[in-house]
């Protein structure tokens, strides 16, 4: 399908099942955290109805369409230009029957879905609180990185309302927010079930973490072996190469 790109847009190869992504060169491009989250969530059952909260350019949804047999994924994105870019990626990959964009704030999702109606939720939310960090970035990057339009509690409360009982939220976040996240998950009856820290090297501090939390589940947390990105020589580890479909 022919896609009309704006001057600031490019098409990148996701190097997985011939999937491609449209990216804004001046905006917020996806990183390894999204790729690892898509792999972490690939256990999502077939025929599932899935939500991607804060879909950005749609990379998580595109990858999950390739990695799972989900029935439908809805990508929620508040920024109109990012939502339009995500739609271009959907068109480019001919995924219109499986991936739909909702250009709205996640706090308005009760207008689109009934409570207890979603099989799985994924999210790579803004990592920084609204009052933290330097803000000399473009508006696009500010909204992607800082909790300006919705905070972490909004993401968790919305997930709790919309998920069916015993269905799961998959999220990637930064270690400094782990205590906040655990408190909010417990508050909204989302039980942390699986946690994996991601490190650049074996001897480095965690860079971010991947977490699965299940609605109304019993309390039992499985902490997995850390995921190491690089060997000591700076090359990717075998696990990362496998995730990137290189081996």
List each language-model region with its residue ranges.
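Class I SAM-dependent transferase core
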Residues: 2-44
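General small-molecule cofactor/ligand-binding pocket signal
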Residues: 22, 100-102, 193-196
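Short glycine/threonine-rich catalytic loop with a Thr-x-Gly-x-Asp
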Residues: 28-30, 56-57, 203
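Residue-level signal for inorganic ion chemistry
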Residues: 37, 124, 155, 213
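Conserved SAM/SAH cofactor-binding pocket of Class I
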Residues: 39-134
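Mobile active-site "lid"/loop adjacent to the S-adenosyl-L-methionine
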Residues: 125-154
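Conserved Class I SAM-dependent methyltransferase catalytic core
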Residues: 149-206
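SAM/dcSAM-binding transferase cores
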Residues: 205-247
């Amino acid at each position: 399908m022919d896609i009309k790109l704006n001057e600031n847009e490019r098409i990148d190869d996701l190097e997985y099942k011939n999937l491609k992504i449209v990216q804004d060169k001046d905006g917020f491009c996806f990183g390894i955290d999204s790729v690892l989250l898509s792999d972490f969530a690939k256990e999502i059952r077939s025929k599932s109805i899935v939500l991607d909260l804060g879909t950005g350019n749609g990379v998580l949804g595109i990858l999950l369409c390739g990695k799972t047999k989900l029935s439908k994924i809805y990508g929620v994105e508040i920024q109109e230009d990012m939502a339009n870019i995500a739609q271009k990626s959907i068109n480019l990959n001919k995924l219109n029957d499986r991936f739909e964009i909702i250009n709205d704030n996640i706090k308005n999702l009760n207008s689109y879905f009934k409570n207890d109606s979603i099989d799985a939720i994924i999210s790579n939310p803004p990592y920084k609180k609204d009052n933290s960090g330097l803000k000399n970035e473009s508006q696009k990057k500010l909204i992607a990185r800082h909790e300006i339009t919705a905070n972490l509690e909004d993401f968790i409360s919305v997930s709790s309302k919309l998920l069916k009982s015993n269905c799961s939220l998959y999220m990637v976040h930064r270690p400094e927010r782990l205590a906040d996240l655990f408190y909010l998950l417990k508050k909204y009856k989302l039980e942390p079930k699986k946690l994996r820290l991601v490190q650049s090297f074996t001897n480095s501090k965690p860079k971010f973490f991947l977490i699965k939390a299940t609605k109304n589940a019993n309390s039992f947390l499985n902490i997995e072996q850390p995921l190491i990105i690089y060997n000591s020589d700076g090359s990717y580890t075998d696990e990362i190469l496998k995730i990137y479909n290189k081996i």
